[in-house]
């Protein structure tokens, strides 16, 4: 029987509880090793913790009854809502839409996991708290800077009176940097964006969810992921009725900024730099290309603020903003270079130990409109990312 100390084995079981089913390739991708992933699959099958079945010519793995019982024993109370037969993720899929949604959720969770965003139930602060619904102030909340992703099911269990929009395509909520991000994922297809449904979901999240979870209003935004330059990876609304939004390549931040510069004169680019194991890669490849597999999520939008004009009339000012999680120093430098040339304000958030490397890559004379702010995050290892 796998032990709680068998970290990766347990994490695979947790992920299966969260998503419902995974292919062998997905499990190998999750543990970031083909050979070790195969060993984990073999061990879990031998211990009858998982079982295999075939659907649409795909071999998929699900939790076996013994695996569900085992999770409940080692993590009591944390997986009850995931393992009920009423939950759609625990029903074998014969519906193409359910299969696609499961695939999207799995891919997104892998990306978050590699970016050290907490995705598993026993790692999330709010799921360990029993005072969410009674909270009236900002105490006993998740770390304001520690990124955590909550699925739609987890949010519903946390806040029973929180209603999501029926037509929304959102997969969950990402909490990071004092913000709530409604997360969407297009995979390699297009996202069917229902403007009214997503607008209602945004308002509900901002007004109800933020107050319930934090005891106060927090900034709430929409975050869309895509797999390639040919797919949608942008916010599908522009804060005016009927607009379809703009489409930018998900893997090319500099080009995205160039495209934005055609329509926006002044903007703010916020970059959050966060990747475990980052220092070792820099030491090994300093000065060369640093490549990561993670896709580059970002969002854009317009913040409207009212001001009094010289003639005394109240008017609205539109401020354009960008936000990005970047894991590649070369892309950071490229994005900053383009933004500076376009006279954008740039704010970079990073660990204290990353600041000197940022300055080395970007150059101290890159521009006076660049601000590097360090944040304090609890890390599982030392600077080498262990």
Features from the language model and the residues they span:
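Short secondary-structure junctions
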Residues: 48-52, 117-122, 290-300
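Exposed, interaction-prone assembly regions rather than primary DNA-binding/catalytic cores
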Residues: 89-200
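A short, polar/proline- and glycine-enriched secondary-structure boundary/capping micro-motif
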Residues: 70-75, 192-197, 334
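Intrinsic-disorder/low-complexity loop/linker signature
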Residues: 57, 178, 311-312
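Basic, Lys/Arg-rich alpha-helical nucleic-acid-recognition elements, primarily the DNA-binding modules
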Residues: 1-86
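Hydrophobic beta-strand residues in large extracellular and virion-surface proteins
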Residues: 41-44, 50, 61, 173, ...
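Long, compositionally biased intrinsically disordered regions
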Residues: 183, 190, 208, 213, ...
